[in-house]
Regions:
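Metal-dependent phosphoesterase signature
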Residues: 57-95, 99
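Alpha-helical substrate-recognition element adjacent to the catalytic core
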Residues: 23, 31-63, 69, 92
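Short beta->alpha linker loops
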Residues: 20, 51, 89-93, 113, ...
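Short active-site oxyanion
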Residues: 104-109, 158-160
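Active-site neighborhood of HAD-like aspartate-dependent phosphohydrolases
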Residues: 1-42
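Conserved phosphate-coupling serine/threonine residues in phosphotransfer and NTP-handling enzymes
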Residues: 13, 111-113
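Phosphate- and divalent-cation-binding pockets in alpha/beta enzyme and binding domains
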Residues: 24, 55, 93, 117-120, ...
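Asp-based, Mg2+/Mn2+-dependent phosphohydrolase catalytic module
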Residues: 1-4, 66, 99, 115, ...
Length: 197
């Protein structure tokens, strides 16, 4: 069946903020009083696509729940400070490609990121007008599959395709019962039995 719409993931699919996020996390760790661990871009890439609190929990598996919540707040504040000042790096051809695709399909955006982060991407990239609707974990507190389903329902989409770069994106598409296209320039590894671009 021919797709009637395209739903995009954000990080690793449309842009890369691993370098400024790593610097932000190191700033947040310093403010939190942790100087023994330095975060790299590779650390950030390894958890990109997970909800923010889960990203922190994966990188700091031994931290108490109480300290985890405080650390999440500290890292989020530092990340917001740096990302709002610097933005990220759009992948080559993304802006032009989205404009061209938007002339053929309704475009949507679903990410596991914080609400402010998605809003800032849309403002910073000047691509807000390209997307008809968008949703994030930070806005709903719900997993990516639920947010894909919400976009599908509220926009009356019959045959959307979710486009992402990780196995988590693929699994979310499966749960939401939508087709999936894997982009191989992001942070994930190839996914079997899907179209890879």
């Amino acid at each position: 069946m021919k797709p009637d719409s395209l739903i995009f993931d954000l990080d690793g699919t449309l842009w890369d903020t691993t370098e400024p996020c790593a610097r932000a996390w190191n700033l947040g760790l310093e403010r939190f009083g942790i100087s023994s661990r330095k975060i790299t871009s590779a650390d950030i890439a390894s958890v990109t696509g997970l909800p923010y609190d889960k990203c922190v929990a994966v990188i700091f598996p031994d931290i108490s729940q109480h300290d985890l919540l405080r650390l999440v707040d500290q890292l989020n504040a530092a990340e917001k400070e740096i990302i709002l000042a610097e933005g990220g790096r759009l992948y080559d051809g993304v802006a032009k490609g989205l404009v061209e695709l938007g002339q053929r399909f309704p475009l949507f955006l679903v990410s596991n990121c914080q609400a402010w982060y998605l809003d800032w991407f849309l403002a910073w990239s000047k691509l807000k007008s390209v997307f008809q609707d968008y949703e994030s974990y930070g806005n709903t507190g719900k997993p990516k599959a639920d947010n894909i389903t919400a976009i599908k329902k509220r926009n009356r989409l019959f045959c959307p395709v979710y486009i992402g770069d990780t196995v988590n994106d693929y699994e979310a598409a499966l749960k939401a019962e939508v087709a999936f296209i894997h982009l191989d320039h992001g942070f994930g590894s190839p996914v079997d039995a899907v179209l890879s671009l």
